[in-house]
Amino acid sequence: MTGPSAAGRAGTADNVVGVEVTIDGMLVIADRLHLVDFPVTLGIRPNIPQEDLRDIVWEQVQRDLTAQGVLDLHGEPQPTVAEMVETLGRPDRTLEGRWWRRDIGGVMVRFVVCRRGDRHVIAARDGDMLVLQLVAPQVGLAGMVTAVLGPAEPANVEPLTGVATELAECTTASQLTQYGIAPASARVYAEIVGNPTGWVEIVASQRHPGGTTTQTDAAAGVLDSKLGRLVSLPRRVGGDLYGSFLPGTQQNLERALDGLLELLPAGAWLDHTSDHAQASSRG
């Protein structure tokens, strides 16, 4: 994920605007915007219970953010920063990802893709730092997730589908061939599942009028290895949860995310009623 050149400094590049802040910095910005809730995955929550100590810390953080151009001289967030943080705090849809990076010692990177209206924001947390990017909608959901994960060669495998609980018990190539795939594909699947360099679980949520949310009870996935990338998508058929595994192309990642979003009440990333209204207003 491409970050700005300096921590806490807002920057622009083409159709992406980004800012990097500490958790304390995010809490100060959220306080200015009267926001208290953020996607759970990011773990943005008050971290200084003593009010007097918090005020001292926040005063210094505000000075730093002002010097870096994130806040103006009146202590208010720069407009684009405010838009990004409001999108995180009051999203219409959210993808929440947890990325376990076995290739760098088991570090977990937490990230989200949020939509509010037609505004899209990516946010990733690594330690106490948060990187936010405002992204053009035409980048697409797969492109936004790949902005965090980076590109990878798709694994050379056939599609594999089965009941999720049954597939979870398959650890050998011989078990996987029972699902009708060729032995060569089964061996690749077994190797990737047994020796991944990283894996990602992504869930989706929808915000309803009044502020309540619904989250999917299943996850889409990305699995990286030396043999390439796999993606998995959940589907419900007759009450059973099925999992489908596919080579990790951008098109298949988009399919996986679309399949995940179908589990939400709205069934999609966009609100079709608002899309229709916007189309009507454009004539």
Curated annotation (Swiss-Prot):
Phenotype on disruption: Inactivation leads to the attenuation of the recombinant strain, in spite of strong EsxA (ESAT-6) secretion and generation of specific T-cell responses. Mutant has lower amounts of PPE68.
UniProt keyword Cytoplasm, yes or no: yes
Gene Ontology BP terms: response to hypoxia
Gene Ontology annotations for the cellular component aspect, listed alphabetically: cytoplasm; plasma membrane
Family annotation (InterPro entries): EspG
Keyword terms, alphabetized: Chaperone, Cytoplasm
Protein's cellular compartments: Cytoplasm
Pfam families the record matches: ESX-1_EspG
Quaternary structure annotation from Swiss-Prot or TrEMBL: Interacts specifically with ESX-1-dependent PE/PPE proteins. Interacts with PPE68.
Function: Specific chaperone for cognate PE/PPE proteins. Plays an important role in preventing aggregation of PE/PPE dimers.
Homology family: Belongs to the EspG family.
Stated name of the protein: ESX-1 secretion-associated protein EspG1
